[in-house]
Amino acid sequence: MNTPATIAISIKSICASIYARTAIRHTLDPNRPPMLTQPMQPALEQLICSTFTTLCLETGASPAARDEDILSTTIHLVPQVNTAAIRAAFERIISLRLLAEAYASADRAYSAQMNTFADTSLAAVRSFTTTAAPHPRKTPHIF
């Protein structure tokens, strides 16, 4: 049994999260790459849309057409799952993946850390969906 849920995500909210994360990071270590700022928002919005679509494919969700600032999707969840928590996880995964991509050439360690965090969050989301294909596993065989 699954429960279809519609999740709506604000592009501007994700941009604000990215700006906040880079501001904190820059404050802690100003010698690192510069912060991502408001003039970069059109580029960030494009990346957010493509990352959102990829995330939908990875979780078995069905993305709807973009409506100005809102990205929405329908995802089938196991019963009793809090939709707000899944929405927050989607936003977190998108933010982390964008940070990983943005810092890939400037700070590889930070980029790898963001990818690890995103993968952990994705695994959690996938555990609550009923439409996502199982994560591939290698099974040892002894002959």
Protein language model annotation of sequence segments:
Residues 101, 106-108:
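Mixed-charge, glycine-accented linear interaction segment located at domain edges/termini
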Residues 87-97, 101:
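Elongated alpha-helical scaffolds
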Residues 40-43, 86, 90:
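Conserved acidic
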Residues 52-55, 102, 122:
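Hydrophobic residues within well-ordered, non-membrane alpha-helices that form the packing/core
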Residues 77-89:
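Short, mixed-charge amphipathic alpha-helical segments
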Residues 1-79, 127-143:
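Conserved short "hinge" loops at termini or chain/domain junctions
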Residues 113-126:
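Short secondary-structure subsegments characteristic of cysteine-rich extracellular domains
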